[in-house]
Each structure stands twice: as C-alpha cells, then as structure tokens.
C-alpha cells in the first residue's frame, strides 16, 4: 500500500488539472496561433509560466485504484499487475481467464 500522503498529493493534482484545463488550453491556443502579434503570444507564454506546476497534466501519476501503487499499472483497468492478478484469480474481472497450454 502506498503512503496516503502520496495518494492524496496525486488526487490534489488531478483536481488542479481539471480546474485549470480550460485556461491552459486557451493560453496554449494563443501561443500556437502564428497570426497573432508576437507581444500577445509572449504575454500568453508568461501567463502560462505563472500558473502552478501541478496544473499541468504531465504531473499526474497513474496509480492503482485499489492499492495506490505507482508502477506497473494497466491504464484500461486502472489497476496494478498485483491487484489485477488477485481480482482475476477471484473471478472478479470479467473475461480474464488464467492462461494454460
């Protein structure tokens, strides 16, 4: 089990990304628009740089929903390999069958 502070920090980042996403998208669109004057684009770059670092989606870590494990996660299930194996052996993941040949 991961530290609760690490899990909570990641959840806080997720909330911050969700709240700041529209503003970041607007600023990025202004920066990418080559028809606008350079001063306006540079001002948008400065505003984007002033925003909190944790409002960037890159800072969010994919963690297991059950254990909070930060590594070896399946994006589709949002579970770590260990949690997926445990749930699969209990028959709680539909379509997951133990391999044998």
UniProtKB/Swiss-Prot annotation:
Name the keywords, alphabetized.
Ribonucleoprotein, Ribosomal protein, RNA-binding, rRNA-binding
Sorted alphabetically, which InterPro entries does this protein's record hold?
A: Ribosomal_uS14, Ribosomal_uS14_bac/plastid
> MF terms per GO, please?
rRNA binding; structural constituent of ribosome
Source domain of life is: Bacteria
| Region spans: Disordered | 1-23
One biological process term in Gene Ontology: translation
List, as start-end ranges, the regions of compositional bias called Basic and acidic residues. 1-10
Any single GO CC term annotated in Swiss-Prot or TrEMBL for this entry? cytoplasm
State the oligomer form and interacting partners: Part of the 30S ribosomal subunit. Contacts proteins S3 and S10.
Tell me its family: Belongs to the universal ribosomal protein uS14 family.
NCBIfam families with a match to the protein in the record: PRK08881.1 (NF006477)
Biological function:
Binds 16S rRNA, required for the assembly of 30S particles and may also be responsible for determining the conformation of the 16S rRNA at the A site.
Q: PANTHER family, alphabetically?
A: 30S RIBOSOMAL PROTEIN S14, SMALL RIBOSOMAL SUBUNIT PROTEIN US14M
Name this polypeptide is given: Small ribosomal subunit protein uS14
What organism is recorded for this protein? Answer: Bradyrhizobium diazoefficiens (strain JCM 10833 / BCRC 13528 / IAM 13628 / NBRC 14792 / USDA 110)
Gene designation per UniProt: rpsN
């Amino acid at each position: 089990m991961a530290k609760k502070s690490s899990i909570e920090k990641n959840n806080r980042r997720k909330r911050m990304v969700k709240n700041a996403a529209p503003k970041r998208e607007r600023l990025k669109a202004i920066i990418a628009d080559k028809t606008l004057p350079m001063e306006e684009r540079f001002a948008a770059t400065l505003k984007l740089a002033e925003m909190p670092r944790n409002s960037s989606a890159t800072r969010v870590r994919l963690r297991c929903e059950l254990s909070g494990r930060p590594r070896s996660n399946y994006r589709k299930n949002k579970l770590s390999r260990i949690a997926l194996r445990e749930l699969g052996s209990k028959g709680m993941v539909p379509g997951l069958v133990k391999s044998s040949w």
